[in-house]
Amino acid sequence: MTDHALLLVNLGSPDSPEVADVRRYLDQFLMDPYVIDLPWPLRRLLVSLILRKRPEQSAHAYASIWWPEGSPLIALSRRLQEAVQAHWHEGPVELAMRYGNLSIEAALNRLAEEGVRRVTLAPLYPQFADSTVTTVVEETRRVLRASGLTLELRVLEPFFARPEYLDALARSAGPHLQQGFDHLLLSFHGLPERHLRKADPSGRHCLGSADCCREAPVEVLARCYRAQCLRSAEGFARRMGLDEGRWSVSFQSRLGRARWISPYTEEQLDALAARGVKRLLVMCPAFVTDCIETLEEIGQRGREQFQAAGGEELILVPCLNDHPAWASALAQLCRTPG
């Protein structure tokens, strides 16, 4: 092996679906100022209120999707790590999580001990958001400063419109679409609207008009999560030859009372059923790995909601996970990260 390593970083998971482990994980996640962007005293107060009931509720959700080998997100991420290593001959491929175990610090220390000099950091998020990409990059830089490790760091930029990502998405999802469907819903993770405004380098473009995402100039597009989600959806639809009326975009996983980007997935599930859609396919392109937001929120609760509203079938299309096309594409993306 040579001295150029990859560090794949995903979100993370509790160690188990037990309430205590879920509480510990949620506390670390929600106290990240990039996730809840409030001053520390207010953030601490809000998170303490959330942790009164949320750990028990989330523990039940985690238990419903937990695998014999543990967290699906962790298990699938490990499989991806192994698959990418088969395509990356420049050095070792390491895996870390932003929250919970498999810390970024431990991964960087292992790489340094192996004699690695260069690291390409790959946040496993196709679209940019401070609460995903920025927090991974900043935590990695913090660890490097604090530890004194002299590793040359490169960062994989968001790859929402890169052909490698979209082609892998098409190859992974294609067989599921060929089974037939009435409608395809592309459900992306949501964000509070204030996060978009905060990330807008112009200070005035985001959410300024109904078509702001489609009209976003290059410098705004580079930091606008919603605009990037729409570009990903459109790129995928073109590759699959989907007519405009057969697919749509929504945003899931709202937390709290603040206004989040819309349309909301839970509202779209009811609306599509009311429109007469019987066989609904749902993809979650903001997630490269299946996790609680896909398997439980969409695959269980979303399915129940859609059927209760009059739909017949909701089929959750698996994420990219460790699909061979994705493993190859990710290695190629990391060779040209900028």
From Swiss-Prot:
GO terms for cellular component: cytoplasm. It comes from the Bacteria. GO terms for molecular function: ferrochelatase activity; metal ion binding. Signal peptide: none annotated. Fe cation binds at H189, E293. Pathway: Porphyrin-containing compound metabolism; protoheme biosynthesis; protoheme from protoporphyrin-IX: step 1/1. The keyword Transcription does not apply. Keywords: Cytoplasm, Heme biosynthesis, Iron, Lyase, Metal-binding, Porphyrin biosynthesis. PANTHER family: FERROCHELATASE, FERROCHELATASE, MITOCHONDRIAL. This is Ferrochelatase. It comes from Azotobacter vinelandii (strain DJ / ATCC BAA-1303).
